[in-house]
């Protein structure tokens, strides 16, 4: 059976990763978390004390980074070389700085090449900010997932608590609103809905409902 490329885009906290994982599992597809790749670069840059808004410097860093995504029992595992950074890339420090790194053309161009290679055989669900517009513009199914700032902050708050991290709901709302502004206004690959993407607001929907809707859309795209 033909396997397609599915592109899920949307702002921070829209539930893309959780939904993409379950959708991929349901369809027996491979899930590719592009956000984790940008987070890995951000972690490496922070650890080396680099200027997060210096594109050429980050471009040089990219040449030395071996970022790998592998499946694991609890979900996707992320490595830089042989070091696992699955949890390290989810800290508040990385979260608050990843948008600075992601706007650098040198970083995006390198990661886009890697992401396209991962997707070339189809049978993938890829989520991010510019998958349908830049990375996989020919994807057979494109969906733009979103939710209210309040709901997205609440989801992130619950995730942080579950990970045993300190979390401030009001602070998260402010951070997400600022992240939206940065992502939508950046010069390189801004966050926006692809012209042929389906808009899906998940504020009032649970995960199972969203996955069911996306499964229907995927089955329709296969016909």
UniProtKB/Swiss-Prot annotation:
Ligand binding (ATP): 10-18
Keywords tagged on the record: ATP-binding, Cytoplasm, Kinase, Nucleotide-binding, Transferase
Keyword Transmembrane among record annotations: no
Catalytic activity: CMP + ATP = CDP + ADP; dCMP + ATP = dCDP + ADP
CDD domains: CMPK
EC number(s) stated in the UniProt entry for this protein: 2.7.4.25
Subcellular location: Cytoplasm
Domain of life: Bacteria
Family label: Belongs to the cytidylate kinase family. Type 1 subfamily.
Main location: cytoplasm
GO biological process terms, semicolon-separated: nucleobase-containing small molecule interconversion; pyrimidine nucleotide metabolic process
Protein name according to UniProt: Cytidylate kinase
Organism expressing this protein natively: Exiguobacterium sibiricum (strain DSM 17290 / CCUG 55495 / CIP 109462 / JCM 13490 / 255-15)
Top enzyme category: transferase
Pfam families: Cytidylate_kin
Keyword Kinase: yes
């Amino acid at each position: 059976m033909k396997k397609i490329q599915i592109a899920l885009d949307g702002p921070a906290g829209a539930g893309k990763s959780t939904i993409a994982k379950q959708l991929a599992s349901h369809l027996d597809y491979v899930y590719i978390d592009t956000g984790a790749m940008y987070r890995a670069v951000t972690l490496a840059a922070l650890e080396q004390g680099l200027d997060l808004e210096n594109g050429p410097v980050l471009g040089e860093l990219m040449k030395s980074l071996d970022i790998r995504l592998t499946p694991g029992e609890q979900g996707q595992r992320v490595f830089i070389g042989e070091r696992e950074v699955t949890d390290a890339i989810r800290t508040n420090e990385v979260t608050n700085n990843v948008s600075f790194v992601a706007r650098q053309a040198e970083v995006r161009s390198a990661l886009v090449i890697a992401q396209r290679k991962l997707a070339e055989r189809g049978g993938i669900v890829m989520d991010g900010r510019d998958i349908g517009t830049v990375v996989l513009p020919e994807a057979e199914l494109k969906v733009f997932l979103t939710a209210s700032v309040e709901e997205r902050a609440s989801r992130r708050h619950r995730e942080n608590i579950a990970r045993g991290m300190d979390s401030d709901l009001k602070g998260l709302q402010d951070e997400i609103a600022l992240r939206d502004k940065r992502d939508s206004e950046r010069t390189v690959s801004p966050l926006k809905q692809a012209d042929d993407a389906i808009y899906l607001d998940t504020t009032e929907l649970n995960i199972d409902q969203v996955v069911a809707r996306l499964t229907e859309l995927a089955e329709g795209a296969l016909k």
